[in-house]
Amino acid sequence: MSLSKEVPSFRWTQSLRRELSSYTQQTKTLVLKDAKMIADSLDFNQVSQVQRVLRKAKRSDADLDKLRDLNQEVDKLMVMKSVQKNTILKLGDLGKDELMDLATDLEKLKRKIGDSGRDGPRPYMGNLTQSQLDKRTQILRVLGFQQQTGVSRGVVRLWDVSNPAKLNNQFGSMPALTIACMTVQGGETMNNVVQALTSLGLLYTVKYPNLEDLEKLTQEHDCLQIITRDESAVNISGYNFSLSAAVKAGASLIDGGNMLETIRVTPNNFSSIIKATLTAKRKENMFVDERPGNRNPYENLLYKVCLSGEGWPYIGSRSQINGRSWDNTSVDLNPKPDPGPRAPEKNGQNLRLSNLTEMQEAVIKEAMQKLDPTNTIWMDIEGPPTDPVELAVFQPTSGYYFHCFRKPHDEKGFKNGSRHSHGILLKDLEDAQPGLLSYILGLLPQNIVITTQGADDIRKLLDVHGRKDIKLVDVRLTNEQSRIFEQQVWERYNSLCRAHNGVIVPKKKNKESNIQKEPHCALLDCIMFQSVLDGHLPDTSLKPLLPDNLVHQAKPAFVM
């Protein structure tokens, strides 16, 4: 792709927001909690000293120590932070093409950011010493050349430090810190600051706020006068009142708009976020521009997400993190060992298998031996295939079944599914055994045939877990056919499933169709589908293959 191609920056931002909407959260409450803690507890005399340091043209090791010490104090006061979490993505986490795409873009980012050591354009420095660089600047000035900063009003600040690696992750704004500084140093109430920044955030949902917008909003919100009208300097810190810092704070306060700033990365959703980012990249033909300059929206998201596999990439404190994105996220293109009948491949959505003890694994293996691969085996799930919350595997001839649950990573999507489909409440998943669902799928016999009602989601679920060997048969019942035995099944077997306690609200567009008043339970659905094929309820008694104390974690006892 030609590097001269213009970047439709805000369109890219909107596309990334849409693609990553399921990973955004409502952050206002946490941000304000952190902001109040900082405002009440931080030594703002120390803040003023650091702000003076950052206005200096040249800064020393002692200056950097002041910044790092203050960052540590802020980090201790905050709940919203990113921690050191290095990630190696392998085949199975992402496809080969996706891994290669990611590796290429991280390498380009390394050349763009790492080699330059700054975000903006700058003169080539080669391996010249600082005294040689100063002399070169003097010669150019005598000859009438302008300083080649590439930014008309920006100021290049120089850090003359013995260990440049200590500069990493000490910069970047945090909404909680921005709000606290505007409140305390601006002599404002936090409510006034929040109202003003919220206006900026709402504007940011439709465009990038600029200085003209800021001037107009300042007429309504006087506290915005503290925002600097100058272009940002290189290596701007969270203690500066820049427009970009204010806009980021506003984005974290509006509780809507699918703002990228509100993404939270966890080990369970990391690879899914990367996959969604690469999907948006392909749709909009996004690219990493290796030329010096500010990061475009795709570069910015990729850098921030890959910096740590756990935390808030945009708005959290990240001063705990060592290294850069290309250090902390790496790609291994070697295929994973064949998991055989035991372990699934991960796709970033599955809880870790290490949560199961060896004894628990042995119990599950023994239970799996009781399934007869030559007879019908049903499978059903609740929740999306990339984030399932319930799994049932049921064999009608024997009455044996696996039935387990899993906490979702996308709580917003889960609540929507609970309201309109399965009725599972989040509190009823708190004791779900981590790793169990994935382990069961990994242990299913090789090349087994699974019967389903609607195969698409099950196929995707199995593919995510590296079980492409499993074949599916879709009975393709109509919605009306599949529910013929619904009431009878619930009356007889409701004791088998006690997690579906929410009220089901029909979607408006379905009011004219058959309204399903009962929640969807993966196990009971398998039973009613088989009942439709048989024309009656099961004759055999149903027997769980796993004890309840394995499916659910023991709750801690209350001690006086």
From Swiss-Prot:
Residues annotated to bind Mn(2+): D380, E382, D525
GO cellular component, one term: ribonucleoprotein complex
Region spans: Binding site for the cap structure m7GTP: 54-236
Compositionally biased intervals (Polar residues): 323-332
Leading EC class: hydrolase
Function according to Swiss-Prot or TrEMBL: Encapsidates the genome, protecting it from nucleases. The encapsidated genomic RNA is termed the nucleocapsid (NC). Serves as template for viral transcription and replication. The increased presence of protein N in host cell does not seem to trigger the switch from transcription to replication as observed in other negative strain RNA viruses.
Protein name, as recorded: Nucleoprotein
